[in-house]
């Protein structure tokens, strides 16, 4: 079975002056994948709202203050049944307003992101992510976190295997 590859980036928040976490899976921004899955569901319900509206969790919380993507994070970012926040509502930044979550299962060889769920006060129905699952090699996952935690100008925007995601001017 082919494993997915993960990378993390750092973006300035659209809301305030802090940094947020960007997540790239197999070179694609996860936020774009999620928004595409949600778009059709929102339209089918006849809602005239913009889907998505996500912003990554605080880069500081994810990598420096806590170890969010290894399951050690603030209680505000963990929901019932061990659902970890990947994105929050970009217009408030308040956990639970419109948060995308998933379970993160970790063993010696693999990290699996599964059971994606939207915790939302905005959308009045449950979104379906169709069994979306990502499987990562534990070593590559750890290296991606290491690069994010030890971000320098040289590696801050570099994917764990050296693929350039983007750079600032």
Map each language-model feature to its residues.
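Intrinsically disordered, low-complexity acidic regions enriched in Pro/Ser/Thr
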Residues: 1-169
